[in-house]
């Protein structure tokens, strides 16, 4: 398991593993490495003029991953995922760990006007984020409205996603981290640890490169037409280093959006003024196995956090642990198996 304290941002890694489904390939350029940005699993075809099955080429060089439905919302699947999350929250609470479900919104919601001609977001998908939040609230899971946070950033004239990449900008990650830190301080006012132990924020640098969607899925001529863009990266402060142990009152588990390259865990630690640890993993593993890998780890057994942030992604929220063809074979399990492993990891 890739469990770290605040990972030092490094340049994107471009190594692809042959034979992986589309899901694994989609995020191969994600910051410090590949993580599970979710997408339907399928063998990626060779780049061609018609790449619409993989990436939507929109207006002004805007690219969108094509694995989220623009027209339909499977409410049965949404509610099934919510039930598992609510059950997990209750079991964690019994162990003294508060669950913070962090649902990140779809890129397309903020840039519908940049979609290709003829592509529109249906009314149900436009409301999908709020629909999921409603499902969670009905089940007793109160979650941060990250869409509202990002909408505020966007209203201020700052982009919240990169033009040719599937990932969020540092401004979006920072705003979300600040909002989540405020929630945590309110709900858990007595965080363990000492003041002054949060991560100091380093200087911002800028990198010119192709976004992952352009790099991986566009033929050379089209990639050149889309062009490189500037990524803002906050380098590690000189005083920042890895923790000697896994002791931290807050842990984050999720996919590539929460890796250090995009700045979220560092900003969360800085805002909380406490250490934060994070685990994420390369490939199409999905959020369910990532949570289990942390709960089943020595880090959790010896140093359970007070708050566990479990990050999910709106377009694939309904993909449960049993989602054949979405996660790799080693990650597939029935909901009952997922629950049994959670119970065992928590000693219940």
Predicted regions: what they are:
Residues 2-7, 36-348:
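Extracellular glycan-modifying ectodomains
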Residues 3-23:
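Bacterial N-terminal signal peptides that target proteins for export
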